[in-house]
Swiss-Prot record:
Compartment annotation: Cytoplasm, Nucleoid
PTM statement from Swiss-Prot or TrEMBL: Phosphorylation of YabA by YabT on Thr-71 enhances the cell's commitment to sporulation, possibly by increasing Spo0A-phosphorylation in cells. The same phosphorylation event probably prevents biofilm formation.
Gene coding for it: yabA
Lineage: Bacteria, Bacillati, Bacillota, Bacilli, Bacillales
Chief location category: cytoplasm
Full protein name: Replication initiation control protein YabA
Quaternary structure (record): Homotetramer. Interacts with both DnaA and DnaN, possibly acting as a bridge between these two proteins. The N-terminus (residues 1-62) assembles as a head-to-head dimer of dimers with a single long alpha helix, and is probably responsible for tetramerization of the whole protein. The interaction sites for DnaA and DnaN overlap; thus DnaA and DnaN associate with different subunits of the YabA tetramer. Interacts with AcuB and TlpA.
UniProt entry tagged with the keyword Protein biosynthesis: no
Keywords: Coiled coil, Cytoplasm, DNA replication, DNA replication inhibitor, Metal-binding, Phosphoprotein, Sporulation, Zinc
Comment text on domains: The N-terminus is probably responsible for self-association. The C-terminal domain (residues 62-119) interacts with DnaA or DnaN but not both at the same time.
Superkingdom of the source species: Bacteria
Cofactor(s) the record lists: Zn(2+)
Induction comment: Constitutively transcribed.
Length: 119
């Protein structure tokens, strides 16, 4: 190998090393950007999961409250409807007390009246 070929080989190696160095720098920068993006995505994911949990808890609480109020309304409505039916039967002339239930009444019954006055 003469000096010129040796010099050309060294220049070629130097260019290859420079190219590899630039590629390594680009790769390092790209990895840094990916790590930063990953960190931001992890934070966003954490916040979204917390928000989802909070929203889910609020929805469950709302459903429970709604179910409870519906149950209370139903109980109140049922009690009111039963009372109204018994009052209607009494007005139509039937006993609603446990002593003479369903029989025709000729005059006011103290048992029936005491039952109607309960709340």
């Amino acid at each position: 190998m003469d000096k010129k070929e040796l010099f050309d080989t060294v220049i070629n190696l130097e260019e290859q090393i420079g190219s590899l160095y630039r590629q390594l720098g680009d790769l390092k920068q790209h990895i840094g950007e990916m790590i930063e993006e990953n960190h931001h995505l992890q934070l966003e994911n954490k916040h979204l999961r917390k928000r989802l949990d909070d929203t889910t808890q609020q929805i469950e609480k709302f459903k429970a409250d709604k179910k409870e109020s519906k149950t209370q309304k139903t109980e109140q409505t049922d009690i009111g409807e039963g009372y109204d039916n018994l009052a209607r039967l009494y007005q139509e002339g039937f006993h609603i007390c446990n002593v003479h239930y369903g029989s025709v009444r000729k005059e006011d019954c103290l048992f029936c009246l005491s039952f109607l006055n309960k709340k």
